[in-house]
Amino acid sequence: MADHDVHTAEAVIDNGSFGVRTVRFETGRLARQAGGSAVAYLGDTMVLSATTASKEPREQFDFFPLTVDVEERLYAAGRIPGSFFRREGRPSEEAILTCRLIDRPLRPSFVKGLRNEVQVVVTVLAVDPEHLYDVVAINAASMSTLLAGLPFSGPIGGVRMAHIDGTWVAFPTYSELERATFDMVVAGRVLPDGDVAIMMVEAEATEETIPLIREGAPAPTEEVVAGGLEAAKPFIRTLCAAQSELAARAAKPVTEFPLFRDYEDDVYDAVAATVRDDVARALTIAGKQEREAALDEVANTALGRLGERFAGREKEILAALRALTKKLVRERIIREKVRIDGRGLTDIRPLTAEVGIVPRVHGSALFERGETQILGVTTLNMLRMEQQLDTVSPRTKKRYMHHYNFPPYSTGEVGRVGSPKRREIGHGALAERALIPVLPSREEFPYAIRQVSEAIGSNGSTSMGSVCASTLSLLNAGVPLRAPVAGIAMGLISDTVDGETHYVTLTDILGAEDAYGDMDFKVAGTRDFVTALQLDTKLDGIPASVLAAALPQAREARLTILDVMAKAISEPAPMSPYAPRIITIKIPVDQIGAVIGPKGKIINQIQDDTGAEITIEDDGTIYIGATEGTAAEAARAAISAIANPQLPEVGERYLGTVVKATPFGVFVSLLPGKDGLLHISELRKMAGGRRVENVEDVLKVGDKIQVEIRDIDARGKLSLVPVDVPGAVLAEDAGAGESAASGGAPRSAGGPQPREHQGPGRPRGRGGDHGGEGRQRTRRRH
């Protein structure tokens, strides 16, 4: 790039009636000191990617040290961060998931044995509200890596495909995604024969999938999803062509990097000759722990017999042993169609499902598949507990939150316990996406939902086990799911025979089959359609036809799992007595202020008096939640009295609460927002006719008193008189639940009885004009 020439290339994506999208690549203008830098544009979305390699290799590493970081800058969306310091902090969940989207196709594209650190930093500079940046970032990262002169088998093209009105649309806009039944990100590379090999897939149905299906849209079945993989291939080819064009003009020459083999041939040959039969016998043991113990003994045997011969090369001996183990596992599957634990290619491990195993929580379930064990726990709460998102995305809140935990003991190991790692965040997001399409709407079920998946035992596909456990737990919590969802992990073993590559697909893979296989293909769905899908591969691409063939095999397994789950629970259970009961009412928008009151005085008073939690939406929808139905009903009555008031009339009696004391009398709350004055002259009657110097000698804030409306003036001000003067003042714990019109028992102030215990040190009075018990403020008369 002499003289800092700026080079560009464009990929034009033609969606027919859905319009044209143009992805533009540019290099030479920004980040010129990076090993390779590129800017990718889609509409006004602008993403900068810089790829740099370290000068010296990390010889002590036995893996490729690739790091991908995505930096979301909130200025990209014209916003200032909401944190205390008003700057970006730790990456958002969306940024972490985008890191994984980039890493998964990039990592297998580097030459094997590379030990130099490679860092890809993607910075989101501008976000078009209509275009998602994650797929743009995949292409930008591929472009910058291609320009950096690294041993990289790119380019890699990434495209988002949405199934809208029966058509697959590339790079859909946000508004178009609202009409999509399926959303899929596909990354791949072009093979020498011109075909496209799929390297990564991340896909899910949408919140609107089931409503759209009911309106006549085609469901995202296995056949439809397979069609989407094929539809993505020409767009990937176009993106790769644009990157290759730019690289031909601006890429650095490929640098020769030192490559480090895990072992030399002489070590492998010696290991194979020494312990091959021992490894083969160990691999016939079905139990994971017993098999691993046997393999550990084989490793000790190999080190004991070969350690002196290959002194100082112990790491090579162990690496060669792993390679031998991998080879034997794959050979047995390819030739004998028998797996490590003795299963056939499509067999599923034993399944068990239970619900309601944890006391007091709102919902719980235990799902087991072989040695994989997932505990699911559901918590319900008010919508105010939705997660608030501070990202560049237009989404600002999330009602359903799925958190996945993977403690080290789940694999019988010791390790760090703390904040979630990228893998845990990714697994939780996958399970979340699998369940979102079947969740009830906010209107049908006005709750914030937190689902936690505890992977307490792991031997393959804890993420898909989390989907199953979560379905069971949600039903146990009483969540009316539109359909149950189950998931299964598929594997792939490939081998070359007579120059032709053969593929064998495995159902329900073990952890070892994941480690020694070529693919981890996770599929979740209902009985009728796919809700989520994820593909990771160690190869530099898999034919789309192989993936399409794996989908029906996954469906058969999914149906089997759903049958087992249905025996545990098939319908939503009654809600836990410890879960909040939420009722919904609608009030006129112009009454929202009256319900809230000055500085929240009225709504806080209602919440204090009833014990209910209240959330008010901008459209006048009010959600009232309480663990007891009576508290929620009391709050609803109080709100209705304000929003749809029945004006007090002369002669009506109320059981009121003293809310303010003044030199000329006390103000008594009859209804929320409706107070009346009990004049000091009336207090004299309660004091036996003697002069009252201090009104609080007779009544204090918080006291309850039976009063009658004597007069209502032209301004609506109420004058009160005490009823049955000798017993007018009630103790704090007097019954206050009854109400009636004049001539019967008195109405209560707002209907509900206040809670007796409000927490230590908390004043019973609340609001801007009155404080705690015994506190007096004077009010100047005008």
UniProtKB/Swiss-Prot annotation:
It comes from the Bacteria. Residues 734-782 are annotated as: Disordered. Its cofactor is Mg(2+). Residues 734-753 have a biased composition (Low complexity). One of its GO terms (molecular function) is polyribonucleotide nucleotidyltransferase activity. It catalyses: RNA(n+1) + phosphate = RNA(n) + a ribonucleoside 5'-diphosphate. Belongs to the polyribonucleotide nucleotidyltransferase family. Involved in mRNA degradation. Catalyzes the phosphorolysis of single-stranded polyribonucleotides processively in the 3'- to 5'-direction. This is Polyribonucleotide nucleotidyltransferase.
